[in-house]
From Swiss-Prot:
Gene Ontology CC terms, in alphabetical order: cytoplasm
CDD domains, per the entry: GST_C_Tau, GST_N_Tau
Entry keyword annotation includes Cell inner membrane: no
Positions of the GST N-terminal domain: 3-82
Gene (UniProt): GST3
Lineage, top ranks: Eukaryota, Viridiplantae, Streptophyta, Embryophyta, Tracheophyta
Official protein name in the record: Glutathione S-transferase 3
Binding locations of glutathione: S13, I54, E66, S67
Keywords associated with the record: Transferase
GO terms (BP aspect): glutathione metabolic process
Similarity comment: Belongs to the GST superfamily. HSP26 family.
Amino acid sequence: MSDEVVLLDTWASMYGMRARIALAEKGVRYEYKEENLMNRSPLLLQMNPIHKKIPVLIHNGKPICESAIIVQYIDEVWNDKSPLMPSDPYKRSQARFWVDYIDKKIYDTWKKMWLSKGEEHEEGKKELISIFKQLEETLTDKPFYGDDTFGFVDLCLITFSSWFYTYETYGNFKMEEECPKLMAWVKRCMERETVSNTLPDAKKVYGLIVELQKTLESK
């Protein structure tokens, strides 16, 4: 019996993009279901009753939640090609550390910058840039975070690049000027079809955020 794979997601989610890239890397066929986060589907609430968030991967009727966990699950289940996690236990631990850092830092700091003004906005902007500078420093002179190969950290970070234009526009800074090595890494990642075919247009993401802000301000 063939695997039944369903992904509950929304197009602009950098977390959902992770699952899509991982599935593409493994060549897994799946059904994509776009969720409206203002009106969550009964299936999403059933499959992720704790957090009620996307993405959710449903594999043969069983839900897997949280994007970093989903990517690791995909790597373990479809392990016959394109390994994403390092084989060395120490390198695996380091990869998990940096993905945890990414997940605890970037989105919350961006939100702080986005939803504030004046001094707090500037503080959020400086903090966001410092996070990317730290990630750039961690990359060192390697082509990828997985050394010579595209791996777990690369996959989990590259999805944020589709939001860089939004960060830059709201923060009035340029990633190319602040983090040139990181942007060179983005270009390398975008050479992979699994990445370039998954990431949405950056200006489309920005348009969504502008509309979302208008909605929030009207309430």
